[in-house]
Amino acid sequence: MNNELIIKGKKAKEASYTLSFASTNEKNNGLLKISESLIKRCDEILEENKKDLEKAIEKGTSNAMLDRLKLDEERVKSIANAVADVVKLDDPIGEVTSMFKRPNGLRIGVQRVPLGVVGIIYEARPNVTADAAALCLKTGNAVILRGGSEAINSNLKIVEIISDALKEASLPEGSVQILEDTSRETATDFMRLNDYLDVLIPRGGAGLIKAVVNNATVPVIETGVGNCHIYIDDEADINMGVDIIVNAKTSRPAVCNAAEKLLVNEKIAEEFLPVAIKALKEKGVEIRGCEKTKAIVNDINLATEEDWGKEYLDYILGVKVVKDLDEAISHINKYGTKHSESIVTKNYFNSEKFLQRVDAAAVYVNASTRFTDGGEFGFGAEIGISTQKLHARGPMGLKELTTNKYIIYGNGQIR
């Protein structure tokens, strides 16, 4: 076991105990100092981010992934503002969600408490570093971060700034830490740090999620993989459908709630596909379609079986013509990742059937999948989008970073 992990694990465990009973004011003060420090030291962050970008460009990283990695003054301000916004959110810690009285006079309550020490393993998104730190701090959790090697310089600087701010706020050392060793061996050891981690949350592509699920002995909450579909029903509004798929695919193609597949009912395909594909190509999207799609719009690439299950995270879209709603639902439930799925239709019964039968964390009617986000749902910031069913599902905000403690009041009862 890597010695860095043991040292940081012990520090995090100690910090989590103190954080568990820190007052809301103390935690909010720490968050405000973090936000202020990120803005004050923006130039330091950008200098380190420049190093990461130069290395990524040398490696031939895609433009979409470079966009996730890149920071500028506005993005740093946005990160700082997101931290400050967490101050405005209600503190769930200590909340008694229910209280009931037993026939023997015992009063039993359910209270929200921190999870303890949260491990987060993620890829090339420096904003996750600050977001995760803020959410964990607000909920009284210590956090150990393991970012991708692509963003190591940016992440180290952000955590340095956060640590300095927490020290100034008199919050415990070890509340927010990051692993400097980004090797796979250390990552695997991190996934097995049961003595110190209470939960592990991976954020990234399918490869990362699979590696964590296969190797972790620490309890895992899966997040992020989004093979999201837009289904155009035979009773869809054509213009609405085009607007939705263009937005869902191109607004930020490298995020998990971007659309990766377009399914089109055969009754509307000849009218819809030429318009939609033209609009998508104007945005630089490569189309990989089924044979029926190619028969309607010839100037595309043929999709393979592998395409239907793939999360591209790029300007690529798989397109398939389906017989009807039932085939669309069957296809989504077979190839989807239980993230976000959408139907475009004017038919109420078709929309209700889609909502009921599609198995996903977020299911939409006549809207882009890009709204699957804690902020857009009104929850505030999020730690990720859970695609599993146990502990949390969908956008994970503050409440999802808590667990229950039963508190029992008696007056001498014995059994």
From Swiss-Prot:
It comes from the Bacteria. This is Gamma-glutamyl phosphate reductase. PANTHER family: DELTA-1-PYRROLINE-5-CARBOXYLATE SYNTHASE (PTHR11063:SF8), GLUTAMATE SEMIALDEHYDE DEHYDROGENASE (PTHR11063). Its EC number is 1.2.1.41. InterPro entries: Ald_DH/histidinol_DH (IPR016161), Ald_DH_C (IPR016163), Ald_DH_N (IPR016162), Aldehyde_DH_dom (IPR015590), G-glutamylP_reductase_CS (IPR020593), Glu-5-SA_DH (IPR012134), GPR_dom (IPR000965). One of its GO terms (biological process) is L-proline biosynthetic process. One of its GO terms (cellular component) is cytoplasm. The lineage of its organism: Bacteria, Bacillati, Bacillota, Clostridia, Eubacteriales. GO terms for molecular function: glutamate-5-semialdehyde dehydrogenase activity; NADP binding. Signal peptide: none annotated. Pathway: Amino-acid biosynthesis; L-proline biosynthesis; L-glutamate 5-semialdehyde from L-glutamate: step 2/2. Its main location: cytoplasm. It is an enzyme of class 1 (oxidoreductase). CDD domains: ALDH_F18-19_ProA-GPR. It holds the Pfam family Aldedh. It comes from Clostridium perfringens (strain ATCC 13124 / DSM 756 / JCM 1290 / NCIMB 6125 / NCTC 8237 / Type A).
